[in-house]
Amino acid sequence: KDNVCYGVLAKDANNNEMCIKAGYTIFACGGIGGLYDHSTNYPHLTGDAIAIAIQHGVKLENVDYVQIHPTTLYTKKKGRAFLISESVRGEGAKLYGKDGNRFANEVLPRDIMTQKIREQMKKDDMPYVWMDMTVLGEEVIKNHFPHIYEKCLEEGYDCTKEWIPVTPA
């Protein structure tokens, strides 16, 4: 009414329509992560619901807030990016540019770490930076991060013995 949403018209499990009235309505509809070349999201997340809301004059807030993970395993393969968890950096993994020098404090907040990585990638003219997990030791890697270890092996990297390429997604 008057371009204000006072609830939602929905269907229950038996396909019966019901009206749910509310003083405020939050439209949480997924995101746009699938639009990015490198993303941990599924490719079908393209912001369709956001576009529909805009077409109907719905006032949207904070749509520019997109979470970017600083470190995912770089690959040329299409599909979802594989997250190299922030906890790996929290355990002590280090990041390096192509010159072999560290360029940032690895435990910076995600948005700042992502910015630092992107700046280094631009400086190096590379689609990734290097992560050194070897400093954690083989036992820690295999026991604390077994899924990451296995995924790196699938991509041709032994993260217990060599640096791995990582990129924001």
Over which residues does each language-model region extend?
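An anion/pyrophosphate-binding glycine-rich loop and adjacent beta-alpha core
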Residues: 52, 58-168
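A conserved FAD-binding loop/helix module that cradles the flavin
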Residues: 35-56
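Glycine-/small-residue-rich beta->alpha transition segments that form the dinucleotide
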Residues: 22-24, 28-33
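Core beta-strand elements of the Rossmann-like FAD/NAD(P) dinucleotide-binding domain
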Residues: 14-24
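Short acidic, glycine-rich loop/turn motifs
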Residues: 10-14, 97-99
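Glycine-rich phosphate/pyrophosphate-binding beta-alpha loops
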Residues: 31-34, 38, 68-71
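A conserved short coil-to-beta-strand element within the FAD-binding core of flavoproteins
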Residues: 1-4
